[in-house]
Each structure stands twice: as structure tokens, then as C-alpha cells.
């Protein structure tokens, strides 16, 4: 059998570097933490796996170990793991187990592992109207007024009920822009961005169809684009998951929990090989994405 460790070395932007206590790319060791961008997500996970390998006699193992390290995970993820998986499928090369070092811990390392992730769809909408003076309502076509009933439908919609592995699909409005900044001038157009994180109970295509039907039912003139940037995946816990759970209990002294929470990961690509997947990594608070985009990414 083949066990693959999947990781990424690309990182999110640092933000203002003067807000960092240490140079974000120095890897500064303060005696307690290694400081630097990407230590938690997820260079630390890669370092841990390499360190573990250096302490065992790999020649004595009855299975093979591989590394799949990408530099295209934080961004559009168009040329990283997805391309490797396409090549592996073409070659009919089989991966049996995959360990992903993404941050998964809530409080104490190992208290949570992931065996799935929700899907994600980004939607950009432009509502078309007609600009005019607020004193002459008959001469304007206010896109803000037009979008309100659409938003009401959108926010009240029960997309699904979730299931035993996934919470119900959720929606968040992330950007809305309209107007020229004056009190007495209505906007010409309105721009809206929103995101849905969806379970295995619904597809990205079904969400797209619902949104388009809402727009049609309200008679809204519009331009809309959809980007299904991640499909949900679920890895049925079997032998590998059992081994990871037992190892955590042996080392840490507690039973871990299994979840499908969090954002997207490259697990969505590697899952297409049919391998069993476990995501196990450091505490959320060690990396920028989970500390309100603050500086001082660090890992002990």
C-alpha cells in the first residue's frame, strides 16, 4: 500500500510587515515558538512529517511513503494537487491512504481530525438599474430596492438539512456596493458578492439553479457569475482513520473527534483517487487565517 503525505508551502499574504514582532519570513526561534508566515498553515505539518520519517527505519516498513507538496493551495489551486491527481489517474496509479497536515486541532494537538470538507461556491451579481434624482422616483430604477426581496429570499432559503457528517449549507454575504456617495442620487448598478459552503446533500449546480430562479422570479435585470471552487468530499473512516485515532489516544491519552468542518483543502482533489483521507495538524490559533488575520503566525 501507498501512504501519501499531502502538504503545501505557499502562504497567505503577510499584511503590513511592521505589525509583526519578527520578520514574517525569518523563521525566528524565540525559545517557545518558531515565528513566520505559514508555520501553522502548513509548513509546520510538513516539518513534523519529515521529522517523524527521520526517526524510523523506512526500509523495515511493509508499505511505501510518498510526498505530494504543492505551492498552489492558498490561491486558485489550478496548477498544484489537481494537476498531479489528473496525472495519477491517467497512469492508473493508486494511493491507498493520505495524511494532510492542515490545521485541525481545537485546543490540544490531536483533539480533532477531519475526514471531509464542505464545498464552496462564489457568486458575483450585478443588479442593473437606472440612476436618477431621489426627488423624482418615477424616473429612476433603484437597484438597491430591487435587490431587497431577492436578498430576503436568499437569506431565508433552507438549502438543505445537512446530514450526520455535515452541517446544513450556509450562506454569507461578503460584499455589497452601490451609489455615488450622495444622499439624493440613486445608483445605476449594485454589486454583490456572496459565498455558500455546502454539504454533500446539494451540488454547486443545484445552488446555481436556485439563485438564477430567485433572480428570475423577482424580474431583476442582472449579470451574474458562478465559481464552484470546491466540491464537498467525505472519506469513509476505515483502517487508516482507526490507526490515526488509536495513535492519538496512545500518545495524547484522549480520544479524538472526527469532523468535516472548516474551509476547503486539497483533500477535495486527492479524494478523486479513492484513497482514505485524514487531516491532522496544529491548533487553529497558530496560523493567520484563524486569528482574525492578525500578524505573528507561529508554531511551537
Where do the language-model regions lie?
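Acidic-enriched catalytic cores of C-N bond-cleaving enzymes acting on peptides and small amides
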Residues: 134-177, 185, 198-223
Amino acid at each position: 500500500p501507498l501512504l501519501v503525505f499531502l502538504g503545501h508551502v505557499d502562504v497567505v499574504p503577510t499584511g503590513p510587515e511592521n505589525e509583526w514582532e519578527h520578520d514574517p519570513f525569518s523563521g525566528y526561534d524565540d525559545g517557545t515558538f518558531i515565528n513566520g508566515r505559514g508555520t501553522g498553515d502548513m509548513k509546520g505539518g510538513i516539518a513534523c512529517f519529515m521529522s517523524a520519517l527521520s526517526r524510523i527505519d523506512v526500509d523495515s516498513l511493509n508499505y511505501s511513503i510518498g510526498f505530494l507538496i504543492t505551492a498552489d493551495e492558498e490561491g486558485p489551486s489550478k496548477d498544484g494537487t489537481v494537476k498531479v491527481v489528473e496525472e495519477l489517474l491517467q497512469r492508473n496509479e493508486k494511493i491507498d491512504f493520505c495524511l494532510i497536515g492542515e490545521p485541525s486541532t481545537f485546543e490540544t494537538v490531536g483533539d480533532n481530525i477531519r475526514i471531509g470538507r464542505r464545498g464552496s461556491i462564489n457568486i458575483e451579481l450585478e443588479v442593473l438599474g437606472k440612476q436618477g434624482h431621489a426627488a423624482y422616483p418615477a424616473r429612476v430604477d433603484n437597484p438597491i430596492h430591487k435587490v431587497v426581496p431577492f436578498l430576503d429570499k436568499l437569506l431565508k432559503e433552507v438549502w438543505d438539512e445537512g446530514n450526520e457528517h455535515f452541517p446544513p449549507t450556509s450562506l454569507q454575504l461578503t460584499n455589497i456596493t452601490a451609489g455615488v456617495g450622495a444622499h439624493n442620487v440613486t445608483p445605476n448598478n449594485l454589486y454583490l458578492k456572496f459565498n455558500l459552503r455546502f454539504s454533500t446533500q446539494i451540488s454547486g449546480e443545484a445552488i446555481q439553479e436556485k439563485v438564477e430562479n430567485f433572480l428570475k422570479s423577482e424580474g431583476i435585470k442582472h449579470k451574474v457569475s458562478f465559481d464552484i471552487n470546491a466540491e464537498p468530499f467525505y472519506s469513509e473512516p476505515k483502517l487508516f482513520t482507526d490507526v490515526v485515532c488509536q495513535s492519538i489516544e496512545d500518545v495524547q491519552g484522549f480520544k479524538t473527534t472526527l469532523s468535516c468542518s472548516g474551509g476547503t483543502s486539497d483533500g477535495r482533489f486527492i479524494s478523486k483517487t479513492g484513497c482514505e483521507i485524514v487531516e491532522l495538524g496544529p491548533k487553529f490559533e497558530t496560523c493567520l487565517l484563524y486569528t482574525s488575520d492578525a500578524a505573528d503566525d507561529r508554531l511551537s
